Amino acid sequence: MAPRSLYLLAVLLFSANLFAGVGFAAAAEGPEDKGLTKGGKGKGEKGTKVGADDTNGTDPDPEPEPEPEPEPEPEPEPEPEPEPEPEPEPEPEPEPEPEPEPEPEPEPEPEPEPEPEPEPEPGAATLKSVALPFAIAAAALVAAF
């Protein structure tokens, strides 16, 4: 039978690995993904997202005010021209109706290629980064017992 100190050491290693793995995964996600907000204490108000470059409530790049559009100058009214008398046009002979052309059959659309999976962001929590501490801790517990 193993001494009690080995059991305590195994539990300690399990806890340390577990908390380290969860901490690394949370740090990789960043504060904006956790829904942390600044302000918005009143009822019905929404705060602003906390970013890495928080400027303590000041807007570093205020939007420029749009310049007023200049008013267009009034155009002088043209003088009306006298209307010429219309000449009688000869009646055109009716043309025979052309036969309607058969519509070409629409070509079937090619199937779209499946989109490739997006590459993970650098530093993002992956299955490997989260599962590895659990595996190490479980192996330590099994080895202790």
From Swiss-Prot:
Subcellular location: Cell membrane
Sequence repeat feature ranges: 59-60, 61-62, 63-64, 65-66, 67-68, 69-70, 71-72, 73-74, 75-76, 77-78, 79-80, 81-82, 83-84, 85-86, 87-88, 89-90, 91-92, 93-94, 95-96, 97-98, 99-100, 101-102, 103-104, 105-106, 107-108, 109-110, 111-112, 113-114, 115-116, 117-118, 119-120, 121-122
UniProt entry keywords in alphabetical sequence: Cell membrane, Glycoprotein, GPI-anchor, Lipoprotein, Membrane, Repeat, Signal
UniProt biased composition (Basic and acidic residues): 31-52
Major localisation: membrane
One GO CC term on file: side of membrane
InterPro entries attached to this UniProt entry: SDr-like, Trypano_PARP
Signal peptide span: 1-27
Protein topology in the membrane: Lipid-anchor; GPI-anchor
Region of interest (32 X 2 AA tandem repeats of [DE]-P), residue spans: 59-122
Function field: Major surface antigen of procyclic forms.
Protein name as it appears in the record: Procyclic form-specific polypeptide B-alpha
Organism: Trypanosoma brucei brucei
